[in-house]
Design a protein with these regions (language model features):
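Active-site loop segments of alpha/beta catalytic cores
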Residues: 1-194
Length: 194
C-alpha cells in the first residue's frame, strides 16, 4: 500500500530507490555466477490487479527493473525459471510478461478468476511450464489420496505431454512434509505410467 502511494506522489524518488535495488541485485547475480551458479528462479510481482490504481505502474516501476535483473540472470547461465508470483494479489492478464526471459515459466493456477492450466501457460509463453499444484489446495491440506489424485488427473489432462510438476507459488510453511513426500513419490510413479 505504501509503495503504491509513493509511486503516485513521489515517482522520481521511487525510481531512484528502484535503481539502487536493481544495481544491488545485478551485483548479487554476478557474484552468484562467479562462484558457479548456473541458473536462477526469478520472481516478479507488480502486475497484479491492485496496482492498476497507479496509471502505468507496471511499465514504469516494475518491468524496466525486472528486465535488467533477469537479463543478467540469463547471461551465461543454462537454466532459469520465470516465476509470476500471485502471493500478494490476483492477475487478470499475463501477456505483459511474455517478453520476460526464462526457459521455464511458473505462473499462477488462476488468471482473471479462471483456471490457468499448464497447457495455457505453454501456449501463451511458447516455453515449457512448471506447476500444476495449487499451493493452498491438496498439497497443503489434502490426504495422500487427494494429492495423488490431483497429480494423476493433471497427467491425464496433459495427454502424454511432458511437464514439470510444482506448485503455483512457494508452498506455505505449514504444508506437511508428508504431503510433499507424497507429491514427489506420486510424480515419480506417474513418470512410468502412460
Amino acid at each position: 500500500m505504501l509503495f503504491r502511494s509513493y509511486a503516485k506522489t513521489e515517482p522520481e524518488r521511487v525510481k531512484k530507490a528502484l535503481e539502487y535495488f536493481t544495481k544491488a541485485l545485478i551485483g548479487y547475480v554476478k557474484a552468484c555466477k562467479k562462484i558457479g551458479v548456473d541458473g536462477f528462479y526469478t520472481p516478479t510481482q507488480g502486475g497484479e490487479i491492485k496496482f492498476y490504481e497507479v496509471p502505468g505502474f507496471f511499465e514504469t516501476f516494475v518491468k524496466p527493473y525486472d528486465i535488467r535483473v533477469m537479463q543478467e540472470c540469463n547471461t551465461q547461465t543454462q537454466f532459469n525459471i520465470l516465476h509470476i508470483c500471485d502471493y500478494e494479489g490476483k492477475y487478470d492478464d499475463l501477456t505483459r510478461f511474455v517478453s520476460y526471459p526464462g526457459q521455464i515459466i511458473n505462473a499462477p493456477c488462476e488468471v482473471a478468476d479462471q483456471p490457468f492450466s499448464l497447457q495455457a501457460c505453454e501456449q501463451l509463453f511458447k516455453r515449457p511450464a512448471m506447476g500444476g499444484l495449487y499451493r493452498k489446495g491438496a498439497i497443503l491440506k489434502g490426504s495422500s489420496d487427494e494429492i495423488a489424485k490431483e497429480i494423476y488427473e493433471l497427467k491425464k489432462t496433459l495427454k502424454g505431454k511432458r511437464f514439470i510438476l510444482g506448485a503455483d507459488c512457494t508452498i506455505l510453511p505449514q504444508t506437511p512434509m508428508d504431503n510433499i513426500r507424497t507429491a514427489i513419490k506420486t510424480s515419480h510413479h506417474t513418470c512410468n505410467i502412460e
